[in-house]
C-alpha cells in the first residue's frame, strides 16, 4: 500500500461526512450544487466559477458548468446551509468561547456593473477609497486555537434595506449568542462606541474593547480623558508573551475601575499595557466588564485581546489562498452566497485541524518552518495533495461490474459507490 493511501481514504471519508451534513434538508439538485461548489472550491483554491467548474470532473463544458453555477448562486437560499455549518462549527469549539469581531473589505477597483457597488477604504493601500463591499465577520477560537467563522456577511451601504454598520454588528452578535451561546467578545478600537457597550450589557455578554484616545471616562474625582488616566498608571505588573516572531519581554500592565459617562451605574475595568509601542511611554488601553482582582486576571485580559490578531490572519488567508477579491458576479445575492460557500470550505479545514488527520496533512505540506500558530495554509496544501491523488485514482477505468454506472467520476461518485470499489 502506498504511504498516502491511508490519509487519502480518511480524508475522503471526512469530506464525505462533511458534505452529507452540509446538504442535510436539501433536494437532489441543491445537494449536487452544494457538493460541486465545496469540492471545486477546495481543489481549485479559487472563487472563480470557471476554476470551480474545471475541478468538477464531469462531461459538461466549463462554460456551461460555470453558467449553471452562476444561476444557482443567484437563487440559492442560504439559510439552511448556514444552519448546518453552524451545527458543525459548534462541535469544535471549547467550553469557554472566545469570539473575535472585526470588519474588512472586498475591493473591486475595476468593477463597474456589480450590483450595489460602493466605495470602501482599502486597508492594504493606506485607506484609499476604492469600489467594493464591506465584510462583517465574527470568528471563534476553536479547540485547536485556530480561528473559525461563526458569522460572515458581505454587504453594501447602497443596499435598499441597509440601516447601519452598527445594526449589522448587533445582528451578528445576537445571532452568535442565539445559535452558539454566551462567550467573551473581543473588539478593536473601531468599535469603541457607547451604543455597543450598552448593547452588550443588555445582552449580558462579557467583552473586551480597545478604547480610542478620544474616550472620556468617569473616575473617582470626575470625568477625564482616558490618556490622562492611563498616564497615572505606570505598569504595576511585569510579564512576557511569546509571539511567532519571538518572545516579547519587558511588558507592563495595570488596571483600575472606571465608568462611562453614558453608563454611570455600570462599573468597568480599564487595563493599560506598556511595551508594544515603539514609544515606551505610549500605552494602549482596553475596557472590559470582566472582574479583575489579581495580576493573573489582568494579564489574561491582555492575552485574550491579543488573540484578536487571529482574525486579521483569517482575513488575509481568505483573500490570498482563494483569491476572494477576484470574484466576478453581478448579483449581490450571488456574491453573498459565494462568501458563504468560501466560509464553509474554510470551516472544513478547521474541522480537519481538530482530527488526527491534521498531523498527516501538515507533513504532506512539507513546511519550511517546524511550527506556526496559523495552520490553515498548511492544512490547505496537504488537503489539495490528497485531493489530487484521489482524483488520479478515480480516473482509472472502473471494474466490469460497474460499467453501467454513469460516466461522472468525482469524489461524491466514489463515496456513493464506495463499497463496490472496495469489493472490486
Description of each model-found segment:
Residues 44-54:
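Short, charged amphipathic recognition helices of the HTH superfamily
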Residues 53-56, 268:
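Polybasic, low-complexity association/targeting segments
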Residues 56-68:
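Short, basic interhelical loop/turn and adjoining N-cap
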Residues 66-143, 254-258:
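Active-site-proximal, Lys/Arg-enriched surface segment
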Amino acid at each position: 500500500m502506498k504511504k498516502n493511501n491511508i490519509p487519502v481514504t480518511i480524508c475522503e471519508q471526512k469530506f464525505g461526512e462533511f458534505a452529507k451534513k452540509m446538504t442535510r434538508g436539501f433536494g437532489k439538485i441543491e445537494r449536487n450544487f452544494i457538493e460541486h461548489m465545496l469540492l471545486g472550491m477546495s481543489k481549485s483554491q479559487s472563487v472563480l466559477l470557471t476554476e470551480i467548474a474545471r475541478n468538477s470532473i464531469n462531461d459538461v463544458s466549463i462554460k456551461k458548468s460555470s453558467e449553471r453555477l452562476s444561476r444557482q448562486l443567484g437563487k440559492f437560499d442560504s439559510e439552511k446551509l448556514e444552519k448546518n455549518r453552524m451545527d458543525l462549527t459548534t462541535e469544535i469549539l471549547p467550553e469557554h468561547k472566545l469570539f473575535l469581531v472585526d470588519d474588512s473589505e472586498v475591493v473591486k477597483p475595476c468593477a463597474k456593473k456589480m450590483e450595489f457597488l460602493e466605495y470602501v477604504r482599502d486597508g492594504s493601500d493606506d485607506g484609499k477609497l476604492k469600489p467594493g463591499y464591506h465584510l462583517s465577520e465574527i470568528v471563534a477560537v476553536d479547540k485547536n486555537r485556530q480561528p473559525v467563522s461563526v458569522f460572515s456577511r458581505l454587504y453594501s451601504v447602497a443596499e435598499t434595506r441597509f440601516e447601519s454598520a452598527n445594526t449589522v454588528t448587533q445582528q451578528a452578535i445576537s445571532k452568535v449568542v442565539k445559535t452558539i451561546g454566551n462567550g467573551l467578545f473581543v473588539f478593536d478600537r473601531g468599535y469603541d462606541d457607547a451604543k455597543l457597550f450598552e448593547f452588550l450589557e443588555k445582552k449580558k455578554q462579557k467583552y473586551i474593547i480597545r478604547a480610542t484616545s478620544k474616550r472620556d471616562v468617569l473616575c473617582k474625582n470626575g470625568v477625564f480623558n482616558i490618556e490622562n488616566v492611563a498616564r497615572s498608571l505606570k505598569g504595576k505588573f511585569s510579564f512576557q508573551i511569546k509571539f511567532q516572531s519571538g518572545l516579547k519581554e519587558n511588558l507592563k500592565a495595570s488596571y483600575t475601575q472606571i465608568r462611562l459617562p453614558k453608563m454611570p451605574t455600570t462599573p468597568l475595568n480599564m487595563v493599560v499595557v506598556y511595551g508594544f509601542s515603539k514609544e515606551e511611554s505610549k500605552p494602549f488601553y482596553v475596557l472590559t466588564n470582566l472582574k479583575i482582582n489579581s495580576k493573573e486576571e489582568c494579564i489574561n485580559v491582555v492575552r485574550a485581546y491579543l488573540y484578536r490578531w487571529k482574525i486579521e490572519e483569517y482575513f488575509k488567508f481568505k483573500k490570498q489562498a482563494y483569491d476572494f477579491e477576484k470574484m466576478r458576479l453581478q448579483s449581490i445575492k450571488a456574491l453573498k452566497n459565494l462568501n458563504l460557500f468560501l466560509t464553509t470550505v474554510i470551516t472544513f479545514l478547521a474541522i480537519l485541524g481538530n482530527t488526527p488527520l491534521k498531523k498527516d496533512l501538515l507533513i504532506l505540506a512539507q513546511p519550511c518552518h517546524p511550527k506556526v500558530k496559523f495552520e490553515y495554509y498548511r492544512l490547505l496544501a496537504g488537503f489539495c495533495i490528497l485531493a489530487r491523488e484521489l482524483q488520479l485514482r478515480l480516473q482509472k477505468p472502473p471494474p466490469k461490474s460497474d460499467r453501467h454506472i454513469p460516466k461522472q467520476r468525482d469524489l461524491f461518485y466514489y463515496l456513493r459507490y464506495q463499497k463496490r470499489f472496495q469489493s472490486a
